[in-house]
Design a protein with these regions (language model features):
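Positively charged n-region of N-terminal signal peptides that target proteins for export
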Residues: 1-5
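N-terminal, intrinsically disordered, polar/charged segments of Gram-positive cell-envelope systems
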Residues: 7, 22-71, 124-131, 135-136
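Short, recurring structural edge motifs at helix starts
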Residues: 49-54, 88-90, 135-141, 172-173
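Short, highly charge-biased, low-complexity peptide segments
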Residues: 7, 138-142, 177-180
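A cross-family detector of function-defining hotspots
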Residues: 45, 62-110, 116-119, 147-200
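Secreted/surface-exposed cysteine- and glycine-rich disulfide frameworks
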Residues: 56-59, 140-149
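C-terminal motif of bacterial Sec signal peptides marking the signal peptidase cleavage site
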Residues: 17-20
Length: 200
């Protein structure tokens, strides 16, 4: 009888012990996932990659970009000495997988900027993005009235594009659906789409 009682007690202790270990593992796993996500998402600057590019324009300067982002960019490329048209390209690494790059071109004393946002497509996946009406986009872009940004948004499911490139003459936007397929579109200063391409 004593042996039976002892066996039951030991079995109960073992079950409690295993349950406790299981809960601890789950908690640790959730904590690690949360920490990982926070590390990926937290920007080193004053804004994340999507906010930063919206605050920049083609007439910006290196000093202005530093002020907006919050730290100095790293020089990653430049023109050869003696070139008629010179440029310098800087990068601001905001996280391990997102950054802003700005190419400053100087010609006859005038400086213009080309701005790009780098980020993984996974960050902007959206199951509301609909590429089933691409033919309608083709029809509109070739029409006499052209294709406006608002019309583009409506045709692809009502989803706003993610700005990823800014120049003097155009803005480029991208969208990614739930399957990871993307569609990029370029709009001129008049708000008309001049070209779109991607994997749909």
């Amino acid at each position: 009888m004593r042996k039976r009682i002892l066996s039951v007690i030991l079995a109960g202790i073992l079950i409690v012990g295993l349950t406790g270990c299981g809960n601890q593992k789950t908690t640790d796993s959730k904590t690690n996932d949360k920490t990982k996500n926070e590390t990926v998402q937290k920007s080193k600057g004053n804004c994340d990659v999507f906010e930063c590019i919206k605050k920049l324009s083609s007439d910006t300067t290196y000093e202005k970009v530093n002020e907006i982002i919050g730290f100095e960019g790293k020089l990653v490329d430049q023109s050869k000495e003696g070139a008629v048209s010179t440029y310098k390209k800087y990068e601001w690494e905001l996280t391990d997988d997102t950054s802003i790059t700005v190419r400053l071109d100087e010609f006859k004393g005038k400086v213009t900027a080309q701005i790009s946002a780098e980020f993984p497509n996974e960050m902007i996946k959206n199951d509301k993005v609909d590429f089933s009406k691409v033919d309608k986009l083709k029809e509109k872009i070739n029409s006499s009235d052209g294709l406006t940004y608002e019309e583009f948004v409506e045709i692809v499911g009502g989803v706003e594009g993610t700005l990823y490139n800014v120049t003097t003459f155009s803005n480029k936007y991208t969208r990614v659906n739930s399957e990871g397929k993307s569609l990029n579109a370029t709009f001129n200063s008049n708000g008309k789409c001049t070209i779109f391409n991607g994997i749909v």
